[in-house]
Amino acid sequence: MIGFKKSKYDEEIKKLIINNFDDHPGDLENTWFPVNRVGAEKQLDNFLKVRFENFGIYEDAMLEKKNFLFHSCISPFLNIGFLTPDKVIKKTLQYAEKNNVPMNSVEGFVRQVIGWREFIRGIYHEEGALQSKSNYWKHSKKLTSSWYDGTTGIDPLDDCIKTTLKDGYIHHIPRLMVISNIMNLCGVDPKEIYKWFMEMYIDSSDWVMVPNVFGMATYADGGMMSTKPYTCGSNYILKMSNYKKGDWCDIL
């Protein structure tokens, strides 16, 4: 990930956060992300030049203690308006055509932006109010402190939680197939899961998290937007990552 110069407001904002939100999750020393439109465009350009070619092969891969891999990490900037889907897609397709980018990378990235992201937005406007009240599995458990500090004893889960705390970001497979999957298997109330995701990620927004949590991640909506629950055990996680087998495999 490319580095960005600190804003002249950085220290002032840090003091404000420490004084008012010191008990909130996160790490103020690891602001890897740009804070303006120019920086967001530079990050998109860097993705296209450095990681786009291999995105299609590795978009679902996980690597212990490694976060960004071949992902663009532009969702925070799309969600607050530094970038627009239209501009991202036009620039992406122009770059792909000029540089002969593999089709699986082009299709995978474009689908995430105008397929998944815009689909989620539509679902939220049509079904979001119903989804946010749904609890198909009747789950009722609460999240304990171990879900917030990464001490659950399940190695991949703890790694993903600690990475989230460090970066305020993690890509879609750890979110879906590790964190929310295990929360759901543990019978955690979907409203608790929604709250956790809203608290922990810099790209969180109600319209993003309601369909993704109540629909995709937990099937709490009973199938409003998907045909089956996304559930897996340790075998899938081992196949998609470099996590080592351990006692956690007997649990998951």
Predicted regions and their residues:
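Specificity-determining recognition surfaces
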Residues: M1-F70
